[in-house]
Amino acid sequence: LTATQQIIKQAEGMTLEELAQKAIEESNGKTFYGVGNSSRGKAALPLFIEYLQSIDPSYSMEFDWQQPKNNKIFEQLTADSLKPEGTFAMTLIQDGNQIESKMTQTGILDTFIPKEWAEANGTTPDAVDGYLALQTLNKVFEYNCTGSKVYDNCWDFVAEDTHALFMDIDSEVVGKNFLYMLTEDKYAAMLKDAFNALPADEQAYFQPTIDEMESEANDLGLGADGKYALAWIKLWVGSYNAQTDDGPICNTLVSDSATDQCGLLVYSKLRSVEESAGVSVNNIKVAAY
């Protein structure tokens, strides 16, 4: 075991309070450096400090939270791992696929399973295969319903002159993974069925792109309906309105002035909307999960 893995092994045999005592010893009066592609880590740190102060009122800790854009977090952590002593005490990463390929398979991050969690689930840390997810979030298609337009088919989001608000695929790889997912036979078949449910005039707009993608789908070894998936992906990537984060997307869509606009975003963002004369969650409808 590496030195880090030995520490993890010790920690997996400790209760939460024992871990907290250890954290107090290690960090009291120091600065805690964290990095993540979500602000949730920064929001959690004051609560962490508050918890440790409930055990030791004299405890204090400063913190510095970095939130790199454009998926730079993996490069940052890789560089940090090459130092004799790393800077970051914590990371929060949203993309399980890349954590596996870029962080754990490379030996940069190791898995920690809390003793009390394992006991509550009738297992032991050694027996747990995989990772503990902090949370699973649903990204949903939403649209502003202050007008007469209705989005009742997934092809509506890539229709002519429609520019859905979407966190750019180079900023958050979850969105890119969603597009890859559509090429799976199950989802490609759903896209075909949705296309067949469209009126003839709308089908006529999409058909040339679908036909264009047929050879591409064959070259990629996709299933019989792969051309529908590639067509939707091509139209989506060519039309979406790139945004830096889901928060601004939500703020735009809930406004009275965003009539008929649509977007793909985390559903939980609606919780932070403050109702006012021109802003309301009632201006939003969820079109599809």
Where does each model-flagged region fall?
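N-terminal low-complexity, Pro/Thr/Ser-rich intrinsically disordered segments
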Residues: L1-S27, I210
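Extracytoplasmic/periplasmic substrate-binding proteins
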Residues: A224-L230, V237-Y289
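Periplasmic binding protein-like
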Residues: D80-M90, S257-C262
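Short, polar/charged alpha-helical segment
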Residues: L16-N28, S38-S60, F141, V273-E275
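CheY-like receiver
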Residues: K22, Q76-D80, T252, D256
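Extracytoplasmic ligand-binding site segments that recognize negatively charged/polar headgroups
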Residues: K30-E50, F63-T78, G86-C250
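Short helix-terminating capping/connector loops at secondary-structure junctions
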Residues: S58-S60, E85-F88, V279-N282
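Generic structural signal for residues in well-ordered beta-strands
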Residues: M61-W65, I284-V286
